[in-house]
Amino acid sequence: MPSSDEQRAQLEAGIAALEAQRATLGNEMVEAMLGPAREKLAALESRSQSQQQRKQATVLFADVSGFTAMSETMDAEVVAGVMNELWAEVDRAVTDHEGRIDKHIGDEVMALWGADTAREDDPERAVRAALAMQAAVARFCETRGMTLAMRVGINTGPVVLGAMGTTAEFTAMGDAVNVASRLEHAAPVGGILIGHDTYSQVRGIFDVLPQDPLSIKGKAEPVRTYVVDRAKPRAFRMAPRGVEGVETGMNGRDAD
């Protein structure tokens, strides 16, 4: 049986061939013949979108503190324009670090690493993106005389990727996503809070401050958390082997 891609290619080729026969066969006949082919193509694409994948990903949530206060003193259209400009800068920090913008919800953004192409350093890229996002917000506020700050939560773990809900919106779901969202809400204003699963893959690369474990509904044990202070000038990735927490090896490389 042909694969989905092969079936799609065959249908698209057949549709193109029929389109080329309009002058000979006439629009009415071509449209009648195109109907079934288009329906099959639409069904194939819908089935493809509904397929879900399980992947290891790093999830980032961030929100802008001070947005509500700003909204109360400015016209709604002006606020929308300002936020669009700010999100353009923030989103660029994500994509510059090979992340994918999953969605914007009001003053919050969700981004993913590993959804499209998995990389060993996805957690590091996410944390570096978070630092770049905060720097972008600081520059934005400095040039406009505004007082805004961004808090960020980052977590790494298995997620389910696919088209979700009645709108078939492509997104990620799962425990790792829920934890990342909780980390964002628990993060200090202007801070980056990461879970232990992310920390275990970036230790030695960033200066971090251990925080109190975070209790999350539905999880048997509290999540160990860390506030990221900054990237180390020259970092070495600490590779845990054997027993977790015992760092017995390292791959030296500059933190570019």
Task: Please give the residue ranges for each predicted region.
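Short amphipathic alpha-helical coiled-coil/interface segments
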Residues: 15, 30-41
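Charged, low-complexity interaction regions
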Residues: 20-29
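Cytosolic regulatory/linker segments at or just downstream of nucleotide-handling modules
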Residues: 159, 186-247, 252
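Catalytic/regulatory signature loops of cyclic-dinucleotide turnover enzymes
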Residues: 141, 155-156, 175-196
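Catalytic NTP-binding/metal-coordinating core of nucleotidyl cyclase/transferase enzymes
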Residues: 48-129, 136
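Short linear X-Pro dipeptides
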Residues: 51, 74, 167-168, 241-256
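Catalytic core of nucleotidyl cyclases, primarily class III adenylyl/guanylyl cyclases
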Residues: 61-62, 93-125, 139-175, 223-226
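Short amphipathic alpha-helical heptad-repeat segments
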Residues: 2-17
